[in-house]
């Protein structure tokens, strides 16, 4: 049966007579059928990757590519007068993640399946995700981001597990979402939910009764934790995920012949950040119910579980008040107390305890003590963990610490989102890079070939024009495609320093007004959501939106400078922005970004990086050479020293530097106040002068100079710029998540063995 006949058998009508919605549902069903054919029996050890978020993005095109059906689908639809791109628009984007943590988890699932490794995800089936972002009067507003429909990729099962929360029993329902690998196997993303969730309790944006657990538990990812009810709700969520997940793991292993004593021969459990940490005491509890004594259960769980640390920020290393756990998961507290006592027999260092003197339970500490592996996610990050942030643990367990530099799936971030570049690469180096990213290095042979360099430039220009069309259609913004597209798209956080970019743009505004024109016009594009309770982050968004209005209203400046803030940034938006980017902003304060993966996506698509020596920027710099990246700012050692000495006073920088003073004072100047809100702008102004915890001001002048150099190179040395872009593409192979997953398997999981 031909592809067309198969689709018509599903729809019951000719393709030309189908609506886009009908064709989407038919393709969804076809993908399910084909995915089921690739499910393979599990032998030996299987991975369970537990994560609070999986930012999987839309799945239709990705699945068609991985199943080898994309070109056939596009041709069959075109023959019927239909466009696959129109059908893709029908698909809602799953609201299951927020930022890099969730996107990494999604990339890892893709690579596991592509490499033929048995590995499933475990998470929650959020109804509204983080939130849907909109801008009203220059201010971020939040509302639900619904995606669940009667026909969803996540299929409801009859499998349920009891979960005890605060003395009450809830029933966790399992939903299964097929994960297809590129020419590989099909694995599963297991998502848990409650049948009792009531979406109608949400009101006034994303407000809801945080105490109605049976109705609210999986409504939102990371519910607002600005009050105690919200913080407790996060504990409820985390326990639902790990309790149901642990029961699923034990059930699947038992069905394969596991007697629980040998669990580590059947399962490898990866704890992705600290959100799933309670799986450790929960597994010990469940093994105890199955007749295994505490000491042996601890040994089994330690052999089975491994932990990935994703942060250097102390605020993100979860520490729950004991009172919360006593109230929500009283069945775990006796086990956590015993684990704390056991940890104290290994060290007298109070700072390494699980339960501290203030009765807070440190999740990361429990993870490190009672897993067999703790890994960082970039070489610099891991060294900082070993030498600074987790030094005491490293001295206690040096054999547990290892690095696994993050990666991205090239299927989504090249094949799917940049088909023009994919076709150009295949024309010159073949298609081997689809599964072996190292093959991209073959492109280096064309570094001095002007024909190839011009082809890459044409690809970038076409991608910029496509982005311009998308921005006009979705954001109602018109941009100059001859300008440098300078993009900073990532979660809004002070350590990622969107505020540094803001001050640069103000500086450029003044320079243009003074007649000092840049080497090239600049379109500065942002995409970011700020946590609803993160006031300063929302103030930064307001300042950027206000500045955008000020510049747009100034004909003298707007010819050279434009600021665009993409509303509701998500995977779909990223797939538009990344292929069109010229200059990739990776400007976090050195020592604060664990890795980053946006830097890798932009690099792969031929953008040049403007960044600090932080996270994976360090390894990108090593790969491409310092002449093919724009590095600026303090080193991590300098930053750590400045924190240790504690002598940083931003007010002194403001007083001593006219450019810094001018840029900061502009925030509360007449132009901004006329277009924005004094409360937001004044608060950000004062924050930068009196606090500036992430050291924006010491890096400001170096940033201005380095960015100016990048713009000059783009405008004045176009051939060299193109060559730099080629080198970045060619050297991106190291940052494939296939490489990352192969290293995890080699060193930590040993799957299928």
Language-model-detected regions and their locations in the chain:
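A conserved ligand/cofactor-binding region detector
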Residues: 1-753
């Amino acid at each position: 049966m031909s592809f067309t006949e198969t689709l018509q058998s599903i729809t019951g009508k000719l393709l030309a007579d189908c609506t886009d919605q009908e064709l989407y549902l038919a393709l969804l069903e076809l993908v399910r059928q084909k995915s089921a054919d690739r499910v393979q029996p599990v032998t030996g050890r299987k991975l369970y990757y537990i994560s609070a978020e999986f930012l999987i993005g839309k799945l239709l095109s990705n699945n068609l590519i991985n199943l080898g059906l994309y070109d056939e689908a596009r041709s069959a639809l075109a023959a019927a007068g239909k466009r696959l791109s129109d059908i893709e628009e029908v698909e809602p984007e799953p609201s299951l993640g927020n930022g890099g943590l969730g996107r990494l988890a999604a990339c890892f699932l893709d690579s596991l399946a592509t490499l033929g490794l048995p590995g499933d995800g475990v998470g929650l089936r959020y109804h509204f995700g983080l939130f849907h972002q909109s801008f009203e009067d220059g201010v971020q507003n939040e509302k639900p981001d619904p995606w669940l429909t009667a026909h969803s990729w996540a299929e409801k099962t009859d499998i349920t597990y009891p979960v005890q929360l605060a003395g009450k029993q809830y029933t966790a329902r399992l939903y299964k979402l097929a994960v297809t690998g590129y020419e590989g196997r099909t694995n599963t993303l297991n998502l848990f939910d409650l049948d009792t969730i009531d979406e109608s309790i949400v009101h006034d944006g994303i407000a809801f009764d945080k105490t109605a657990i049976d109705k609210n538990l999986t409504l939102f990812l990371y519910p607002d934790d600005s009050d105690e009810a919200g913080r407790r709700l996060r504990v409820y969520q985390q326990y639902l995920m790990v309790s149901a997940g642990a029961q699923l793991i034990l059930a699947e292993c038992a069905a394969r012949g596991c007697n629980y004593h040998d669990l580590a021969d059947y399962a490898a459990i990866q704890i992705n950040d600290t959100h799933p940490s309670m799986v450790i005491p929960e597994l010990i509890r469940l093994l105890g119910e199955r007749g295994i004594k505490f000491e042996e259960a601890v040994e089994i769980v330690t052999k089975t579980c491994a932990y990935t640390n994703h942060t250097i920020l102390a605020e993100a290393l979860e520490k729950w008040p004991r009172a919360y756990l006593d109230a929500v998961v009283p069945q775990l507290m006796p086990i956590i107390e015993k684990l704390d006592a056991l940890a104290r027999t290994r060290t007298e260092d109070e700072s390494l305890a699980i339960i501290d003197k203030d009765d807070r339970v440190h999740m990361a500490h429990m993870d490190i003590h009672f897993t067999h592996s703790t890994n960082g996610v970039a070489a610099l990050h891991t060294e900082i963990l070993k030498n600074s942030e987790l030094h005491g643990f490293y001295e206690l367990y040096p054999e547990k610490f290892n690095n696994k530099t993050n990666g991205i799936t090239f299927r989504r971030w090249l094949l799917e989102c940049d088909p023009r570049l994919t076709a150009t690469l295949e024309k010159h180096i073949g298609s081997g890079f689809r599964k072996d990213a190292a093959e991209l290095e073959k492109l280096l042979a064309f570094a001095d070939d002007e024909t190839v360099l011009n082809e890459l430039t044409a690809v970038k220009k076409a991608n910029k024009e496509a982005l311009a069309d998308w921005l006009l259609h979705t954001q109602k913004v018109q941009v100059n495609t001859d300008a440098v597209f300078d993009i900073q798209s990532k979660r809004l956080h002070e350590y990622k320093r969107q505020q540094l970019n803001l001050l640069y743009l103000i500086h450029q505004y003044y320079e243009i007004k003074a007649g000092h024109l840049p080497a090239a016009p600049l379109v500065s594009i942002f995409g970011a959501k700020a946590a609803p309770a993160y006031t300063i982050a929302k103030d930064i968004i307001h300042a950027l939106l206000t500045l955008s209005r000020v510049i747009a209203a100034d004909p003298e400046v707007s010819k050279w400078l434009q600021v665009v803030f993409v509303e509701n940034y998500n995977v779909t938006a990223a797939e538009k922005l990344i292929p069109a980017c010229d200059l990739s902003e990776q400007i976090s304060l050195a020592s604060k970004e664990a890795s980053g993966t946006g830097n890798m996506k932009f690099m792969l698509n031929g953008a040049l990086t403007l960044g600090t020596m932080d996270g994976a920027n360090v390894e990108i710099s090593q790969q491409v050479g310092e002449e093919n990246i724009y590095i600026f700012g303090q080193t991590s050692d300098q930053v750590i020293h400045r924190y240790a000495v504690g002598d940083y006073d931003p007010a002194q920088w403001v007083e001593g530097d006219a450019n810094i003073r001018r840029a900061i004072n502009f925030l509360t100047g007449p132009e901004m106040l006329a277009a924005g809100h004094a409360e937001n702008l004044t608060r950000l102004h004062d924050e930068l002068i009196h606090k500036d915890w992430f050291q924006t001001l010491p890096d400001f002048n170096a940033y201005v100079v380095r960015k100016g150099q990048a713009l000059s190179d783009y405008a004045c040395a176009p051939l060299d710029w193109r060559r730099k872009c080629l080198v970045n593409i060619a050297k991106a192979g190291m940052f494939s998540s296939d490489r990352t997953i192969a290293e995890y398997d080699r060193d930590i999981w040993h799957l299928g063995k």
